[in-house]
């Protein structure tokens, strides 16, 4: 069929990829499409392996267009120092915050990352901000990001500055993390029910969560490639 690329033909593949780059460049620079700029950055990163140019496009698209996915990706570049950018957690935090507040495919991941960076204090002169971390973990947990739900359970399990210990809330978020497939969410829920740790003791629920933790752990091991 005319127009289809023979992906076994090296010359056709090269021409196809070059045309993609031209198309995305046109979308970004001529048509001023934020989505086109994001596609161009992905093309530069994944096809051309030109991380410096990808970082440049991501920065423009995040700073000028506040494109959620580009801000998320740029935040990751700042975390690792990729694409010639300096390792700069405050810049990463700003990128993730934009992405989280903007919404989009990676906004939930970005909200979780804002929570992480606020939680460990490295973007606030080594002063953890548990309240801000909680607020952004809640946003991510509401979007069914399991790790954020688990981190919320840990905050309420131990208490933090400005956040009193609350075993009912700890159990609530631990159970949600478990239901989203987080092994330790299941394990902690099981333990709390087994010991009656701040909640009504319930051996049946303890066993149920224990079995779920075991099943999830087994599934994870099966998915992990064996050497």
UniProtKB/Swiss-Prot annotation:
SUPFAM superfamilies in alphabetical order: HCP-like (SSF81901)
Cellular component annotations (GO), alphabetically ordered: mitochondrial intermembrane space
Subcellular location: Mitochondrion intermembrane space
Keyword RNA-binding (UniProt): no
Pfam families (UniProt xref): Sel1 (PF08238)
Gene3D superfamilies associated with the record: Tetratricopeptide repeat domain
Domain of life: Eukaryota
Protein name as catalogued: Cytochrome c oxidase assembly factor 7B
Species in which this protein is naturally found: Xenopus laevis
């Amino acid at each position: 069929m005319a127009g289809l690329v023979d992906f076994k033909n090296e010359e056709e593949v090269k021409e196809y990829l070059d045309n993609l780059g031209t198309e995305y460049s046109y979308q970004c620079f001529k048509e001023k499409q934020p989505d086109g700029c994001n596609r161009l950055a992905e093309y530069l990163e994944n096809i051309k392996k030109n991380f410096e140019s990808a970082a440049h496009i991501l920065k423009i698209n995040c700073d000028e267009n506040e494109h959620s996915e580009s801000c998320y990706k740029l935040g990751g570049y700042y975390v690792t120092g990729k694409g010639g950018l300096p390792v700069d957690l405050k810049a990463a935090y700003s990128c993730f915050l934009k992405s989280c507040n903007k919404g989009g495919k990676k906004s939930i991941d970005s909200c979780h990352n804002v929570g992480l960076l606020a939680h460990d204090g490295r973007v606030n002169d080594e002063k953890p901000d548990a309240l801000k971390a909680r607020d952004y973990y809640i946003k991510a947990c509401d979007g069914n990001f399991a790790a954020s739900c688990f981190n919320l359970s840990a905050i309420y399990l131990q208490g933090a500055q400005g956040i009193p210990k609350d075993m009912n809330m700890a159990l609530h978020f631990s159970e949600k993390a478990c239901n989203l497939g987080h092994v330790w969410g299941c394990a902690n829920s099981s333990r709390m029910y087994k010991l009656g740790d701040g909640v009504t003791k319930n051996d049946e629920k303890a066993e149920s969560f224990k079995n779920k933790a075991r099943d999830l752990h087994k599934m994870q091991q099966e998915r992990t490639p064996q050497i």
